[in-house]
């Protein structure tokens, strides 16, 4: 039988330090300096500190299956060696998990090594963070820089993100593309509070799920605050989504709902409230039911219904070449909308709007 001293020495050698434990108790606090040590020792720790970890190429920082109630702290600078692969760079699951960043920490993905202006095409790029099965948990105060591709893939119930910074500003000039901040699917109860995002795709994309709340967001440089695309997935229901008190600037779109042509599903109980836009290049408000192979066709279908949509105090300006509002619905599939204090200026009026409820203006 190994002595406690020998076990402790082994932990130090392997990139792990254990504290607050006796030989027969689970360790309370662990500091890991390598991804391998974190994966091997995570189940024994109620508090995990990830200290200046450099994740090897083609490897996930694997924090799946954490013990309920575990606290995870990112400390120092977390980095990732280069390989063309699908990722994710980090994956985490468990219940009642609390994730925070220590003062001065940075999760630096150095995405420019992968960026080629082609996003999901071109060279293979890893997604950043899978929050799949990270239930009844919270992620607070993380500082993330230059993700190669999408940042958070969220498939979880009762999860809250607070004060998360995703700074992919370098991607504006270095080929960043498809760098979505929060992609939500198959989730019930997702709260995203005061995020700061500069990226080159959706600030928020809700593809399926219920009870989603996004508030106090700052969204710069991307594709705006989106529902969809909805359709052609195993789950094609989006219900009870509130997006409020947020700004969207220097982006392609501000408010967007899009559904897949020929698909079935439903989008309902959607509220956009107190959204301020500026510097929008394509559409201020766009709701369209004609997406196919990732592109609009101009031919809407009605298999995915869009009901009980409320826009209130959605204001601001778009570029002179942009369209202020574009509403393209299938026959009878858009209904029960509320439209209050929607004022988008600076651009063109659309002449191609179709089948939208009379309370809206186009």
Swiss-Prot record:
Single GO MF annotation: polygalacturonase activity
List of glycosylated residues: 240
Catalytic reactions of this protein: (1,4-alpha-D-galacturonosyl)n+m + H2O = (1,4-alpha-D-galacturonosyl)n + (1,4-alpha-D-galacturonosyl)m
Function: Involved in maceration and soft-rotting of plant tissue. Hydrolyzes the 1,4-alpha glycosidic bonds of de-esterified pectate in the smooth region of the plant cell wall.
Cysteines joined through disulfide linkages: 30-45, 203-219, 329-334, 353-362
Listed EC numbers: 3.2.1.15
Gene responsible for this protein: pgaII
Record-given protein name: Endopolygalacturonase II
Keyword field: Cell wall biogenesis/degradation, Disulfide bond, Glycoprotein, Glycosidase, Hydrolase, Repeat, Secreted, Signal, Zymogen
Propeptide residues, chain positions: 22-27
SMART domains cross-referenced by the UniProt entry: PbH1
Family: Belongs to the glycosyl hydrolase 28 family.
GO biological process, alphabetically ordered: cell wall organization; pectin catabolic process
Record-annotated active site: 201 (proton donor), 223
Cellular component annotations (GO), alphabetically ordered: extracellular region
Subcellular location, record wording: Secreted
InterPro entries recorded: Glyco_hydro_28 (IPR000743), Glycosyl_hydrlase_28 (IPR050434), PbH1 (IPR006626), Pectin_lyas_fold (IPR012334), Pectin_lyase_fold/virulence (IPR011050)
């Amino acid at each position: 039988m190994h002595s406690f001293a020998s076990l402790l020495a082994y932990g130090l050698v392997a990139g792990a330090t254990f504290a607050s434990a006796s030989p027969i108790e689970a360790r309370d606090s662990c500091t890991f300096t390598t991804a391998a040590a974190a994966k091997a020792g995570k189940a024994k720790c109620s508090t995990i500190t990830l200290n200046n970890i450099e994740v090897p190429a083609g490897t996930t920082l694997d924090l799946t299956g954490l013990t309920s109630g575990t606290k995870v702290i990112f400390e120092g600078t977390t980095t990732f060696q280069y390989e063309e692969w699908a990722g994710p760079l980090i994956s985490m699951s468990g219940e009642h998990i609390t994730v925070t960043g220590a003062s001065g920490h940075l999760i630096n993905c150095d995405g420019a090594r992968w960026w080629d202006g082609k996003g999901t095409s071109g060279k293979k790029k890893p997604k950043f963070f899978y929050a799949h099965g990270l239930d009844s948990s919270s992620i607070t105060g993380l500082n993330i820089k230059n993700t190669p591709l999408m940042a958070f893939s969220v498939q979880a119930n009762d999860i809250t993100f607070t004060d998360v910074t995703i700074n992919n500003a370098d991607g504006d000039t270095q080929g960043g593309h498809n760098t979505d901040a929060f992609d939500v699917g198959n989730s019930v109860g997702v709260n995203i509070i005061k995020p700061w995002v500069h990226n080159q795709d959706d600030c928020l994309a809700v593809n399926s799920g219920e009870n989603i709340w996004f508030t106090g967001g700052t969204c710069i440089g991307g594709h705006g605050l989106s529902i969809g695309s909805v359709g052609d997935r195993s789950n094609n229901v989006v219900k009870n989504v509130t997006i409020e008190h947020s700004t969207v600037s220097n982006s392609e779109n501000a408010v967007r709902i899009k559904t897949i042509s020929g698909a079935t599903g439903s989008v309902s109980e959607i509220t956009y409230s107190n959204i301020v836009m500026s510097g929008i290049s394509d559409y201020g408000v766009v709701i369209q039911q004609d997406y196919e192979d990732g592109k609009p066709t101009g031919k809407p279908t009605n298999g995915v219904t869009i009901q009980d949509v409320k826009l209130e105090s959605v204001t601001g300006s778009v570029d002179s070449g942009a369209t202020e509002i574009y509403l393209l619905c299938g026959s009878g599939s858009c209904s029960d909308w509320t439209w209050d204090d929607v004022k988008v200026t600076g651009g063109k009026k659309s002449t191609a709007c179709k089948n939208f409820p009379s309370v809206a203006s186009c």
